[in-house]
């Protein structure tokens, strides 16, 4: 899955690294040329770890069966819930519970890690 007319995001669900491989997040983030980029880095049991390099806003969505964890590496991430906005700085994380309408925004280029179930659809249900 990559950018399309409905969702102009670069989303790569292929797993980039296997066990016993070094993952260089900084090199991947520095090489990113997109405003909204999501790359699956590795699989850990039934979950995946994804790198997001983001600027702008994602659409409102929810995941009916899956929680979603966001962790900021660099920049600031805003997570909008229906009546609340969470602001995350580097080294801060937040879990959005399953079934919760949300969207993420970044006013500046921001690098994040996401941990979610292997089969999750990133754009929501």
Label every PLM stretch briefly.
Residues 1-50:
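A short, N-terminal "cap"/entry segment at the start of jelly-roll beta-barrel domains
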Residues 34-35, 48-64:
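Conserved short histidine dyad/triad with adjacent acidic residue
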Residues 45, 80-84, 107:
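Short strand-coil-strand connectors
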Residues 45, 73-74, 89-90, 108, ...:
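A cytosolic small-molecule/anion-sensing beta-strand core signal
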Residues 53-54, 63-80, 115:
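Short, conserved beta-strand element in jelly-roll/cupin
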Residues 82-98:
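Short acidic-glycine-tyrosine-enriched beta hairpin
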Residues 98-125:
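Ligand-binding loop in jelly-roll beta-barrel domains
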């Amino acid at each position: 899955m990559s950018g399309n007319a409905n969702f102009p995001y670069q989303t790569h669900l292929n797993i980039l690294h296997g066990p016993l491989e070094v993952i260089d997040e900084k090199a991947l983030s520095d090489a990113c040329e997109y405003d909204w980029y999501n790359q699956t880095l590795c699989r850990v049991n039934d979950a995946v770890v994804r790198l997001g390099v983001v600027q702008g806003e994602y659409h409102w969505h929810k995941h009916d069966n899956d929680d979603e964890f966001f962790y900021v590496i660099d920049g600031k991430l805003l997570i909008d819930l229906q009546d609340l906005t969470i602001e995350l700085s580097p080294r801060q994380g937040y879990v959005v519970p399953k079934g919760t309408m949300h969207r993420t925004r970044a006013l500046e280029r921001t690098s994040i890690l996401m941990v979610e179930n292997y089969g999750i659809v990133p754009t929501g249900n």
